[in-house]
Amino acid sequence: MKNLCIKARAPSRIGIGGGGSDLPSFFDSYGGAVLNVAINLFSYTKMWRTETGKTHITSHDWEIERDIEDLGLEFELNKKDNVDMVRAVMKSASLSPKDGYEMVIHSMSPKNAGLAGSSALIVSLLGAMFNIAGKPMMNRDTFAKTAYDIERQMLKRPGGYQDQYAAVFGGFNFIEFGKEINIYPLRLEEDLVSEWHSSMMLFETPFPRKIFAHEVERKKDDEVKKGGKSIEYLKKIKEYAYGMRNSLVRGDVKNLGELLHLSWLEKKKLPGVSSNDIDLLYDTAKQNGAYGGKLCGAGGGGFLFVVCDIADRKKISNALAKKGARFVNFDYDFEGMVSWRTNL
């Protein structure tokens, strides 16, 4: 045990369709459905035991290097050195900082990218902590629900369910929400996987979110609870997700892209999602051959997802580069969360 090192990783995700309908405030009354795919922008955890009587956390992309000695939550979401996430996962895994741990965490997904990097990190942390504690790993469905409870209940960060499921299961997934949550992994043939990989593009926009993702989600949640027009928008977004699922399994790139476009027109009506600059960038992608696209995650900035024919990839990439957007290469991840043991 002295030289034992635990590592874990979990993938980020691209929410293809249905985003927002996975909010409990919506699906409890109207049902929800989302289509997403896990990608190889991973969140990593490395941890090992020490004899210091405290837990030391290092994360260069979070700009964190701190000791913690208790599990008290600070609830200061905007602090650069926020470690509530680590504390909440330790509490869920029944670990104590005073047991003595060294922990290094790293996320390949930039903060506020809309790719669910924070959810992936929670899943990665949870996998590593269960491993180091020698606890039997939960089944994947229970694992995803536990990660959801940590992020949404313990940390009180608003949002839906899909992020945790993508990070735990990996691959393409269609998830229905209602009285129960049912996840349907979509097992595509190798040719279809290649077709979709050549037809999907991801861009980092030059527009950072002016507000944090959890604030966008909170506004959306508040609108739904008020019973306003957001409910009608989300109903349409949910229905488009079913059509996108059917297009995905058929390999119908154009139809999925067109449904993605219609879904985006509804999503941008939600509070805090789009802006004039984002609309201009999206229109540029469409003018250069994109069938459709959307901002990833809650919106307000971050990453732009585009579906197109393979012949138009370069034209779209060049046009968006002139607008300051950076093409981000990615691959699909079909493993989901994995944790393993090695020596220090």
Task: Show where each model-derived region lies.
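C-terminal nucleotide
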Residues: 1-17, 21-28, 34-97, 132-133, ...
